[in-house]
Amino acid sequence: MPFFPIIKLKFESVVGNILTLEYIFVAKISMSDRVRVRFAPSPTGGLHLGGVRTALFNYLFAKQQGGDFILRVEDTDQTRFVSGAEEYIIECLKWCGITPDEGPGFGGEYGPYHQSERKPLYRQYAEQLVNNGFAYYAFDTPAELEEKREELSNFQYGHAHRKEMTNSISLSQTEVAELLAKDTPHVIRLKVPQDETISFDDLIRGEVSFETSLIDDKVLLKADGMPTYHLAVVVDDYLMKISHAFRGEEWLPSAPVHLLLWKYLGWEDSMPQWAHLPLILKPDGHGKLSKRDGARLGFPVYAMNWKDAKTNELTQGFREIGFLPEAFVNLLAMLGWNDGTDQELFSLKELIEKFSLERINKSGAKFDFEKARWYNAEWIKRISKEELNQQVLEVFKAKGIQVADKNQLAQIIDLVKDRCTLLTDFIAQAGYFFHTPEEYDLGSVKPKWTNEKESFFIAYGAILNVITDYSAPSLEVSFKALAEEKGLKVGDVMLPFRIMLVGGKFGPAVFEISSLLGKDETINRIQNGLNLLKH
């Protein structure tokens, strides 16, 4: 059942001549309103796994409640806009199976879904706030602001200093009108009240409180007419009828600014209920996981590969190193959530059924790459043969490995999948079925190589040439019989045979390999091995 907040005012105390108010945001239940959540990324680069988890939790909650998941692109900061980033974000969501009900390319009646296309709306509401005394024009130049910061190390553009600055509070109405008439560059700032306590009920953290004396007068509308995040998120959430807002814990300090905007715009009864998600922490638990941490520790932090258009720097993604989308979604869900049981493997459908806000942790979740690899290994065993075959085929294609016989590929995958943690492991574990080994571990064979062993393989090649039953059991019988006939221990010729076939001391049962390679290829590899061992 969806929850929607209303606002109540509690008169707390009068100290001297200052009235202290506490705004308490509490929830009321609405039986008629539909759950609507949004994922609102900025198209500024690769999508961090924390961002994907935010999208996932929004999606799980919406689908469980029979609601809508909206994709909204927050592209108001044009200085940070990166071409191709939006398409990348959509592709990431698609890979994870997270399909928006509304958004760019998905339709919907509450568009446009790019904030850059909603610019006139923000100006309208910013001016409304000014007219009602909740915001003001500020004409300070960047140089003047910098000078003030140098003068006062703890400078905060708020109630303590706003009258010292160039704005519609310190200036007369005539002066303000003249500046506006001249199109003097200006911003619109929120007028944060003094000495008030703002509290709200977070769906994860319970009651959270803030003192307004610690909050500066945030810019709502920039000099170029574009809104800041603070104004845009409130206006868009209201107009798009967002019922619940899930976002990372790092946005918690912005909550009081947004609460004030909901109140000042007169939209208290429509304000969404918030849930601030725990951070994804570095493996040691000290600090938020960053892109640099991944590079330093050798694992990705992006969902998919991201190439910086300016530097051409390529940052690896989970998809490209060989993660299944099912495993990636599963591990993300378990970063800060569990269903209260020992179950660890969940399909997207199961996550939708079992997801609950009550089971989200307040504290941050350590990222464990080895655990992530475990999830992937388990999902390689769990997904259908058809799906796994297709995934491996895509990996092979990306590496230029040609597969002519898909039935043979299916047999090979079934043979080696228990040895694979990542999809890319199939290249090492199965690539030799489709091309001769590029390297051979001859150092493990040459020291003990003898004329007797060479004679054995020449004879075994001749046997293979005429054998009719090329099954693994038949090959094993003939191999062992010949070894006995030649007076050799099976173990003494088994390792050379494996290295001739695959290049190293790895892989499944050697006769299974030989059977799948086929008669001609096995004979060719034996001959190639003999030639290499002569040098």
Q: Where are each of the predicted segments found?
A:
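N-terminal amphipathic/basic-hydrophobic helices that include classical n-h-c signal peptides
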Residues: M1-S30
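N-terminal Rossmann-like or analogous alpha/beta NTP/dinucleotide-binding catalytic cores
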Residues: Y23, I29-N154, P253-L265, A327
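Glycine- and acidic
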Residues: V37-P43, L71-D75, M240-F246, K310-T315, ...
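Residue-level signal for inorganic ion chemistry
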Residues: N58, I89, L129, G133, ...
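Active-site cores that bind ATP or allylic diphosphates and position pyrophosphate for catalysis
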Residues: Y137, T141-D293, P300, L314, ...
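Short, glycine- and charge-enriched coil/turn segments that flank and shape catalytic ligand pockets
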Residues: E147, N154, E175-D183, K385-Q390, ...
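Catalytic adenosine-cofactor/nucleotide-binding cores of aminoacyl-tRNA synthetases and other
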Residues: E268, Q273-Y440, V502-H535
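C-terminal accessory/binding modules appended to enzymatic or scaffolding proteins
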Residues: V445-L501, F506
